Amino acid sequence: MFRMLAKASVTLGSRAAGWVRTMGSYQLLVPPPEALSKPLSVPTRLLLGPGPSNLAPRVLAAGSLRMIGHMQKEMLQIMEEIKQGIQYVFQTRNPLTLVVSGSGHCAMETALFNLLEPGDSFLTGTNGIWGMRAAEIADRIGARVHQMIKKPGEHYTLQEVEEGLAQHKPVLLFLVHGESSTGVVQPLDGFGELCHRYQCLLLVDSVASLGGVPIYMDQQGIDIMYSSSQKVLNAPPGISLISFNDKAKYKVYSRKTKPVSFYTDITYLAKLWGCEGETRVIHHTTPVTSLYCLRESLALIAEQGLENCWRRHREATAHLHKHLQEMGLKFFVKDPEIRLPTITTVTVPAGYNWRDIVSYVLDHFSIEISGGLGPTEERVLRIGLLGYNATTENVDRVAEALREALQHCPKNKL
């Protein structure tokens, strides 16, 4: 065989000869990893943290379906059904509605990269980690970033936002509907109309709230909204949902400069997802299996009905709050009206280390809960009731685990 290749190299010239020599000149320095000789093993756990969440059986089954080409007609039909599902859960008729092949962070960047240009004034509500992240991304773009900073656990009023709009005259306002790091749900009624009076677009992050908390993109005047797959939707992490209305689309398509990212350029993604009615154009290879799962998760919500889904989360969370109050735990968010129904934050009880509690619940009950994030790190425990997991049975399980953890975890009496 080698003689045949060597003879061919003489015929083809020096380039081919170099290729033949390369094939035989090097030895493998890295052996096959021993770990990969063993079958993959994953523990069985109840995921009651801020996400990801457990997959419903139907969604899990979708992940094992056969692979098909990402631009074949059958896949394009699935993509069309996903778009319709997003329009339902977003409550929007926006044609420019699609999936971003990346996590919620990628959706945030997709929105900001496409809407902001260097020098644009950008106003963000920073009452948790996600406002901080939005400010960081906008700063990297070269926007003039203005933050309305509030204490974690607080929300924004129309008056406060209007003062920011009048002072900074932004082209874009960013608000988080469900702030997963603090457990706050931000009221949205009136904010879209207010922004439009000041010629400003409203961008809303609904990653931790979509499907579990009422939100109406069109009726509430939200110009751009995004969410993610792994929380209430109960799909695998790694893809996100986004929608632009006509005002936001005009801002994107009338840019003076190209977006800083080719991968998240919405003008290309719109063609890939058939949002303009034209022949679809390949931009990147979409995550086919993840889209199968997302399609099924959206179908489950459509079958259940949004109002029923919202009610189930509200009832399960009320049941959880009752247990927490009986244990003497204190809610991090003082105002009951702005407590996020999908993710509850409780202050770490005095004398306890949050890591001990989280570890005990995991080790003894195979239940995942979480500590704080960003401004709430070391300060809170976070308990998530997301989609398929939002049941009173699961609440009773995690309440039992917490009670036992508080009895057995070391407590500093000083």
Swiss-Prot record:
| Key word Lipid biosynthesis present | no
What is a single molecular function from GO for this protein? amino acid binding
Any single biological process term in GO = glyoxylate metabolic process
Which keywords belong to this entry? Answer: Acetylation, Aminotransferase, Mitochondrion, Peroxisome, Pyridoxal phosphate, Transferase, Transit peptide
A matching Pfam family: Aminotran_5
PTM-bearing positions, type N6-(pyridoxal phosphate)lysine = 231
If you read the UniProt record, what top EC class would you report for this enzyme, in one word?
A: transferase
**Gene Ontology CC terms:** mitochondrial matrix; mitochondrion; peroxisomal matrix; peroxisome
Superkingdom: Eukaryota
Q: Which residues in this protein are found as N6-acetyllysine?
A: 247, 256, 330, 334
Instruction: Locate the motif Microbody targeting signal.
Output: 412-414
The residues the record assigns to binding substrate are 382
Mark out the transit peptide: 1-23
Q: Which cofactor does it need?
A: pyridoxal 5'-phosphate
InterPro entries recorded for this chain? Answer: Aminotrans_V_dom, Aminotrans_V_PyrdxlP_BS, PyrdxlP-dep_Trfase, PyrdxlP-dep_Trfase_major, PyrdxlP-dep_Trfase_small, SP_NH2Trfase/AEP_transaminase
Residue numbers of N6-succinyllysine PTMs: 247, 330
State its Enzyme Commission number(s): 2.6.1.44, 2.6.1.51
Subunit arrangement? Homodimer.
Family note? Belongs to the class-V pyridoxal-phosphate-dependent aminotransferase family.
Name this protein carries in UniProt:
Alanine--glyoxylate aminotransferase
Its gene is Agxt
